[in-house]
Amino acid sequence: TLSYSSAMLGLCLNNIGLPVVITASDYVPDDKRSNALINFKACVDLILQSENGVYTVYKNKTDKYARIFIPTRLCEADRINDVFTSCDDLPPVYINEKGMISGDLLSDDTKHDMMPGLSDIDFRKSVLLVHPYPSLEYKSITIPENAGAVLHITYHSGTVSEKALFLLERCRERGLPMFLCSLKSNNNSIYETSDILLKNGAIPVFDTGNESAYAKLLLAVNLYPDDIAGFMRKNIYHEII
């Protein structure tokens, strides 16, 4: 859940004027194999050097030092090797055991649309997240009664089954928007299957990781139900690459 938590906190806490650092561990802290203490120390070192902004810190077993991630670009860990990655192509930034940072962090003054001050968020509405796989039976999908939108992930190439039209029609009957994620804005040719869905009313989410798209849509349906698509187009905290 680190990637989803990071995305939500990055979107919500980027304007509080303090550094916020999120982390986790691969094992419980008292396990000798755990990276908990390494991650925690790296978080403290980063806080001492950062004026504000939200970051995620985690040491992968494949890295020498803890890595500093942009929280809204963190991808879910590889389930076999437990390795976290970023969905951008920027050079990785690390923080060593002495607190020295190698690489450049994204400046917090990078142009983005700030979230309004949030004292309380009531997540009364949910978002149905659909991860496709070959032979997925769309008729078996139940849209929750409290759903405010549906987010359908596309395959890596931006394709999706034509059977998703059935789900899109059910969304239309319920008055719910259906968004397509994992689409690239610089792709001059959208595959026919995705194009069919878009021409029938699906809304594209360009250049955004799945986790951030989900967290952002969850905020949109609960905070801005009258302008969900407009909110999804805003770049709140570096989530649009």
For each predicted feature, which ranges?
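Active-site histidine-anchored catalytic micro-motif
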Residues: 1-138, 145-241
